[in-house]
Amino acid sequence: MSNSKYFQDELTYLRESGSEFAKYHPKLTHFLSEGTFDPDVERLLEGFAFLTGRIREKIDDELPELTQSLMTLLWPHYMRSIPSLCISELKPHTGSVTEKTVVKRGAEMASEQIEGTQCLFRTCYDVDLYPITITNIEQTNSRTSSTIDVTLSTEHGLELSRIGLDTLRLHLYGEIHITRTVFLWLFRYLDYVELDVGGGYKHRLGPEYVKPVGHEEDEALLPYSKNSFAGYRLLQEFFSLPDKFMFFDIKGLKWLKGIPQRSTVKVKFHFKRALPSEVVLKDKHLRLHCTPAVNLFQKDGDPIRLEHRRNEYKVRPQSNTQEHYEVYSIEQVESWSKDERRRKPLIEFESFEHQINQRDKREFYKSKVGERVSGRGLERYISFHTHNGDIADLGTETVLMKLQCSNADLAERLSVGDITYATHKSPTYATFKNITKPTQSVSPQVNGELQWQLIANMSLNYLSLANIDVLKVLLSTYDFHSRVDRQAHRASIHRLDGIVSSEIKPIDRVFRGVSVRGNQFKLVTNSKFFVNEGDMFLMATVLNEFIRLYSSVNSFTELEVFDEATGEVYNWASLIGQQTIL
């Protein structure tokens, strides 16, 4: 039972009504009247209160048997906790990297021990390592414009033309009021980028060579099924780790390959509008070789020895400290027969393969999610079925499982710089450390009204977003952190108050000589309800990606945002699917 309220209510009722009952049955006064408790009777009352509390909780749980099956089939990620997240920085070993070296996403890193357990994180972005460092950042402001000069120098004087520098990814790190503002200036007021290697060698890049990061499928923080729309993932990740989007790529750097004998380049960002006086970019605010990281890793499950007395079994990772782990997902299930001496794969019941070749005697598994008794985190249960849903008779076979796990709420106890230890899946030519504190692990409400809210979202179309209340409910539904963190909850409410109105209207555009009809989504906001104007712009950028869900294959969407506080109008290019068409 995850909610102690039910237990306390039942126990209080038994004690209070017990006194009244004892008045009519004097022989039981010694056991039931207040102030004179028999320890054995007290234990019986507590046990009875626990069981009846579970019954009440079951009555109030709003039919999770229906919602969980549907969610497992369509949106399995909402039956999983959001693991701890952070930003990690990699640094190549001196002399070990002399040209572009890619660290693929999924590289592993371990933390300091907490209660004897190391928390494992894996990277979410590919990281291009170069033998370069940021040696200086200068900012120049005038009344009408600003310039930020970033000086990059190679290690030991290596030539820029020889290190394979084609795309450079930078991370905006530090105070929110600075990073969000610079993000806004990069994608709203950037005039051009100039590469200066000295000696009169200069090259100009347009604003289209600076690209945002974090919207693509291969840049996801959380594993998502192919059945799920990536727009919902973006919303969930935005509320979980907004710094994930504080990255940008500078493309078009192949020009440097034609300039020999240069080891230093100045990357100059020229803006058409002056930065606010309180925004001063320093060396610490721009980082190279960074990536988000998530507390997820592969682990074997405890083998399950099947027995006829049980239909459902708890899924446990192999560990002596079960409380340090939480099962994120079941990746593989096999049964092993001692008599046949072979492994037989079991397929998830919701895969619908049970409807194929029904004559074959195949077994399937179902998983169920519930809250831990402690109320922190989720636990999973597994059962085995035939093709028609009946309980399968697997005899005395043993079930083996491969799991994807997190360290539950253990990882949130880590601090900046605690994730520095290598594993066999870590890069050998670089060191790493987390430059942000890992976030709190957050579990969804698996038994209750949230599941029905999520199912209701499936029926949304672009007309639904024209209702400002529906839009706010949609956004708050995916903000899991605001459900467990009071400060995050207040910030979420304040942010939603800054969304004033929404409107959708059909529009026509000409693309390659052909008239195409789409939908323009107009949003009125007030940046005073956000951290600053840049914070509002970041949320609108994520929303721009999200509304692609409501565009059919032969149509497009277009976002326009009006800020009441400043009078600024922001427009995003028309999108069809995942392609910019105008």
Model feature map: region roles:
Residues 1, 9, 13, 49-59, ...:
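Short linear motifs embedded in intrinsically disordered, proline/glycine-rich low-complexity segments
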Residues 1-22, 32, 210, 215-259, ...:
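Mixed-charge (acidic/basic) macromolecular-recognition segments
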Residues 1-201, 205-214:
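Extended assembly-interface regions of large multimeric machines
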Residues 27, 337-582:
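C-terminal domain/tail detector
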Residues 40-41, 48, 52-59, 77, ...:
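Extracellular ectodomain segments of secreted/surface proteins
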Residues 107-110, 262-272, 397-404:
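Short, aromatic- and glycine-rich surface loops/edge beta-strands on solvent-exposed regions
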Residues 155-361:
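Short, low-complexity Pro/Thr/Gly
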